[in-house]
């Protein structure tokens, strides 16, 4: 009965968000707006003028971007809250939370694509710069759990290929974390806790003075310990046995950004600790990552801009018990990007990249310990993208990236599209793009007793067709997208041999479906959002390659009063996962993940000086208090692993000062 009411609520919010287009809301011209009012005005005006930078590497309207995209605004971040980046991304249309048995315990899948045991089909960017993990090929749990979300200005998500401009891993999606810019001086601190042992804290300092901009912040979280029973078949007798386990979920992160007259430096640190379930044995996995980028922009001519970037990232993982692994890998990337504007109708983007990756893995399950990976590889790429406006309402886009990865042959991936605005506020997009994911160091060179790399592997490939129709005005934003992806040369593990061997799958895989999204401001205070994803996937032999529900629906409702009281609720419905059933642990089931965020800004009531303030907030996740078990992706047994403990409640305080 309760599930039916929640499903009905989703439908009502979705229909409201996609059906009502009213008159423009009058804008407040006061220069003395507080932060909340400023955000209201920005987003009411910005729904029809949302600028994005990820699709083309320069600022353009969302309707002009040659990609299918979703944007999480600063206003949405403030209204709905979220302790981690994963919490926020699970609200994005077309994204679904996922998990695996070992290194990547926290992942998101874009439009159902989760064929790997890590997030290697998604490229994460920080202000446009890539953050890759090159040993396994895509671990991102530390970023999703520990990046300081309090510093985010917005998140741009490309749903579909992005390799023409971003290279390897920009396969089924790209997530660009865009941080805030300093204006004057801002100091902000928050702390929260709960009765079950949960705790979180964050701080941020933003300073702009004399052309120098400094943005600094940090975040910490500790989830309640989860005492549960995990059952497995992995033992000599092949009989089910139980393990009492206390599962951890902790993380910390920091970020620093310095900007001075075209010269930029940014760096981040993220660390996370969680559980692993390799061969059915419960253990701990700890990961940490350092990231740094030095960039410089200059104007070579009146219509020619250049950007130079040197990017470094290092990822370290430890599993001190079984599977007794220590990993250490890094990537150095040098990129030169050019933007040439020939006229109002013609624009060219081109650039080149050179990167070097290396990594080691030590297996200490035997004595003496074994060095099972010690690899390195060079890579390079050249990309070009051209856009031409045939008319004011019709634009053509085309591009290609040629790349050379290690000893592999030269290869290329293209993109092309047609963007048409047939009437005011309406836009149509017909896009095709290809992408690739290069084999990781482990996939080509691992010499573990249980798993061996294959030096003959070739990159995974995908080609995606997108057909999108959208409507935007200053109160509403609605889009419907049909997608069809054909993936080839997917890399899997052949577990029929001992040791297991990586290989390229011969049969292609197909993902297709409908992805729809709507956002609507009823008034300045009321905001609704909703989305529906339906996808199916298969290859020649398997009907459900990916452990992601075919049907998912999301809905959020938020009220932000002028007196500083915000109340928001969000429901994430995940349907039944076809083809996956657990034989001994709880089975994966359809569920509603309900969250709420309530904030009381007491500044107006208690402080006359608007430059200082404090607020109380209450945030709750998984309010139905239902434990979530998901398929044990990457294991040979039909089993599940524990992912979400149940209800988590935080009560916290924020204080800030602006100058």
Regions found by a protein language model. Give the residues of each.
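Extracytoplasmic beta-strand/coil segments of soluble accessory domains associated
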Residues: 53-62, 66-70, 86, 90-130
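N-terminal periplasmic accessory domains that precede
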Residues: 85-88, 107-112, 122-127, 142-145, ...
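Short acidic/polar hinge/loop motifs at secondary-structure boundaries
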Residues: 130-159
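Periplasmic-side early beta-strands and strand-to-turn transitions of outer-membrane beta-barrels
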Residues: 164, 176, 185, 192, ...
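Face-selective signature of the C-terminal outer-membrane beta-barrel domain
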Residues: 257-272, 288-410, 419-421, 476-480, ...
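Outer-membrane beta-barrel signature, preferentially recognizing the C-terminal barrel domain
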Residues: 282-299, 327, 375-377, 421, ...
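Gram-negative outer-membrane beta-barrel transporters
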Residues: 389-395, 478, 482-486, 504-580
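C-terminal beta-signal and adjacent terminal beta-strands/loops
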Residues: 528, 600-659
């Amino acid at each position: 009965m309760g599930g039916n009411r929640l499903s009905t609520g989703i439908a009502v919010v979705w229909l409201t968000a996609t059906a009502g287009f009213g008159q423009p809301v009058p804008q407040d011209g006061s220069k003395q707006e507080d932060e909340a009012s400023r955000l209201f005005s920005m987003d009411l005006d910005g729904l029809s003028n949302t600028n994005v930078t990820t699709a083309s590497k320069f600022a353009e309207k969302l309707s002009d971007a040659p990609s299918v995209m979703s944007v999480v605004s600063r206003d949405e971040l403030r209204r709905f809250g979220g302790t981690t980046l994963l919490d926020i991304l699970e609200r994005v249309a077309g994204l679904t939370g996922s998990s695996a048995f070992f290194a990547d315990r926290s992942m998101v899948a874009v439009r159902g694509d989760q064929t790997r045991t890590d997030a290697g089909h998604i490229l994460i960017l920080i202000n446009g710069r890539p953050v890759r993990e090159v040993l396994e090929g895509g671990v991102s749990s530390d970023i999703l759990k520990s990046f300081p979300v309090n510093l985010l200005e917005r998140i741009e998500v490309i749903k579909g290929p992005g390799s023409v401009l971003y290279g390897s891993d920009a396969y089924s999606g790209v997530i660009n974390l865009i941080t805030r810019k300093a204006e004057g001086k801002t100091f902000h601190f928050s702390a929260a806790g709960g009765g079950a042992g949960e705790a979180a804290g964050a701080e941020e300092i933003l300073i702009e003075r004399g052309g120098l901009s400094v943005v600094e912040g940090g975040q910490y979280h500790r989830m309640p310990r989860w005492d549960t029973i995990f059952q497995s078949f992995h033992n000599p007798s092949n009989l089910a046995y139980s393990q009492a386990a206390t599962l951890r979920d902790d993380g910390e992160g920091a970020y620093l950004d310095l900007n001075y007259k075209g010269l930029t430096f940014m760096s981040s640190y993220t660390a996370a600790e969680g559980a692993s379930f390799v061969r059915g044995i419960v253990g701990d996995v700890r990961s940490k990552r350092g990231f740094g980028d030095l960039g410089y922009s200059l104007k070579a001519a009146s219509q020619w801009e250049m950007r130079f970037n040197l990017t470094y990232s290092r990822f370290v993982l430890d599993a001190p018990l079984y599977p007794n692994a220590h990993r250490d890998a890094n990537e150095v990337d040098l990129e030169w990007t050019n933007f040439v504007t020939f006229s109002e109708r013609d624009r060219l983007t081109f650039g080149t990249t050179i990167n070097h990756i290396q990594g080691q893995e030590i297996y200490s399950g035997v004595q003496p310990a074994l060095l099972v990976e010690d690899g390195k590889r060079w890579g390079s790429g050249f990309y070009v993208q051209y856009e031409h406006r045939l008319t004011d309402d019709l634009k053509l886009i085309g591009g290609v990236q040629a790349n050379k990865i290690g000893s592999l042959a030269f290869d290329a991936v293209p993109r092309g599209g047609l963007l048409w605005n047939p009437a005011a506020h309406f836009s149509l997009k017909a896009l095709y793009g290809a992408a690739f994911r290069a084999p990781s160091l482990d996939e080509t060179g691992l010499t573990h007793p249980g798993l061996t790399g294959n030096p003959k592997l070739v990159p995974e490939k995908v080609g995606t067709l997108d057909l999108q129709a959208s409507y935007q005005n200053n109160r509403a934003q609605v889009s419907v997208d049909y997608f069809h992806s054909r993936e080839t040369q997917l890399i899997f593990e052949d577990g029929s041999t001992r040791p297991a061997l990586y290989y390229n799958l011969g049969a292609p895989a197909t993902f297709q479906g409908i992805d729809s999204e709507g956002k609507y401001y009823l008034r300045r205070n009321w905001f609704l959002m909703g989305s529906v994803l339906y996808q199916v996937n298969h290859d020649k032999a398997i009907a459900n390659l990916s452990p992601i529900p075919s049907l998912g629906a999301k809905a959020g409702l938020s009220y932000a009063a002028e007196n500083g009281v915000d109340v928001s609720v969000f429901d994430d419905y995940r349907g039944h996962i076809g083809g996956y059933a657990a034989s001994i642990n709880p089975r994966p089931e359809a569920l509603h993940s309900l969250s709420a965020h309530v904030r009381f800004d007491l500044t107006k009531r208690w402080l006359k000086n608007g430059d200082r303030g404090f607020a109380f907030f209450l945030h709750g996740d998984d309010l139905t208090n239902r434990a979530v078990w998901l398929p044990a992706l990457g294991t040979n047994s039909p089993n599940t692993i524990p992912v979400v403990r149940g209800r988590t409640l935080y009560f916290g305080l924020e204080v800030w000062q602006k100058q």
